[in-house]
Amino acid sequence: MRIGIGIDVHPFAEGRKLIVGGVDIPSPKGLEGHSDADVLLHAVSDALLGAAALGDIGLHFPNTSAEYKDIDSMILLKHVGRLLTKNGYRTVNVDAMLLLEAPKIAPYVADMRRNIARCLDIDTSLVSVKATTNEKLGYIGREEGAAAHAVCIIETL
């Protein structure tokens, strides 16, 4: 078994959709980034790539490439899942934590879990998504951005 960790951060911006875990969440502002800026899926992707020692999302999906401009991060996570399989691994578990003050994401967690599981072709019971605030501290507390942390376990096929 191998363990990976992923962390991602994006600032909020006016005129952007808030996409988290592949879910379009109603919000007056969204996250800024080269892709759809899905902070949760980026952290999960990095955790999986790290566990397999396959680099990170910046290596596989550079923000200098027009190919990935505004791309749906579920497409990226599916690619990571296929890359793991190609290299002889399968996902055992994904545990992810979202850090943001608002909006509350509890109503969307089940959909996020299903999206991650579907992208990785695993059972939803193997995916955990949680959220917390930053207690009004720092850039997250000031609602300037959001972050996500993810830990995963993979094993050889």
From Swiss-Prot:
Q: Name one Pfam family in it.
A: YgbB
Q: Indicate whether Ribonucleoprotein appears among the record's keywords.
A: no
Q: Which GO terms describe its molecular function?
A: 2-C-methyl-D-erythritol 2,4-cyclodiphosphate synthase activity; metal ion binding
Q: Is-annotated flag, keyword Magnesium?
A: no
Give the cofactor binding note: Binds 1 divalent metal cation per subunit.
The pathway it acts in is:
Isoprenoid biosynthesis; isopentenyl diphosphate biosynthesis via DXP pathway; isopentenyl diphosphate from 1-deoxy-D-xylulose 5-phosphate: step 4/6
Q: Kindly report, in one word, the top-level EC class recorded for this enzyme.
A: lyase
Annotated positions for site Transition state stabilizer: H34, T133
**What residues bind a divalent metal cation, as annotated?**
D8, H10, H42
Under which EC number(s) is this enzyme classified? Answer: 4.6.1.12
Q: Which residues form the signal peptide?
A: none
Q: Which residues bind 4-CDP-2-C-methyl-D-erythritol 2-phosphate?
A: D8, V9, H10, H34, S35, D56, I57, G58, T132, T133, N134, E135, R142
Which UniProt keywords are present, listed alphabetically?
Isoprene biosynthesis, Lyase, Metal-binding
Q: What does the record give as cofactor?
A: a divalent metal cation
The catalysed reaction is: 4-CDP-2-C-methyl-D-erythritol 2-phosphate = 2-C-methyl-D-erythritol 2,4-cyclic diphosphate + CMP
Any one of the GO BP annotations: terpenoid biosynthetic process
Which InterPro entries does the record cross-reference, listed alphabetically?
A: MECDP_synthase, MECDP_synthase_CS, MECDP_synthase_sf
Residue runs in coiled coils: none
Oligomer status and interactors:
Homotrimer.
The free-text function statement in the UniProt record for this protein reads: Involved in the biosynthesis of isopentenyl diphosphate (IPP) and dimethylallyl diphosphate (DMAPP), two major building blocks of isoprenoid compounds. Catalyzes the conversion of 4-diphosphocytidyl-2-C-methyl-D-erythritol 2-phosphate (CDP-ME2P) to 2-C-methyl-D-erythritol 2,4-cyclodiphosphate (ME-CPP) with a corresponding release of cytidine 5-monophosphate (CMP).
What family is this?
Belongs to the IspF family.
Its recorded name reads 2-C-methyl-D-erythritol 2,4-cyclodiphosphate synthase
Q: Tell me the organism.
A: Chlorobium luteolum (strain DSM 273 / BCRC 81028 / 2530) (Pelodictyon luteolum)
- Taxonomic lineage of the native organism: Bacteria, Pseudomonadati, Chlorobiota, Chlorobiia, Chlorobiales
Please name the gene that encodes this protein. Answer: ispF
